Amino acid sequence: MLYNWAAENPEKVKCIAGIYPVCNLSSYPGLNRAAPAYKMTESELEKNLHLHNPIDKLKPLAEARIPIFHIHGNVDRVVPLKLNSGIISKRYKLLGGKMQLTVPEGQGHNMWEGFFKCKELVDFVIYSSKENFNSDR
């Protein structure tokens, strides 16, 4: 939902920061579980997935030069790195967007303190939120 809102309102977004974020509805929570949030059946969501799936809605963000930072563990089985932050990183860079992906080794989808006390993420948000940051884009 975060990426969808940002893609529809890029002029209101300074940056996107995520801790093991869901970026691919097919991967998690799965179309059958995601469909009700979009007021659709699973088959309707599958047919219209390109309109709602964050990995398919990156172009407006790249065009607006919105920087992205994710921290995502390499052994996350709930929201797999490769199918979520990994795809976002690859596609966003191909669109010319700037993204930093930090991958802590041996971490999954858990409450590891390093996710929530990541100095790089905090610094990224503070820097990106500065009023004059828009001129840097």
Residue ranges, per PLM feature:
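Alpha/beta-hydrolase-fold catalytic nucleophile elbow
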Residues: 17-20, 71, 104-105
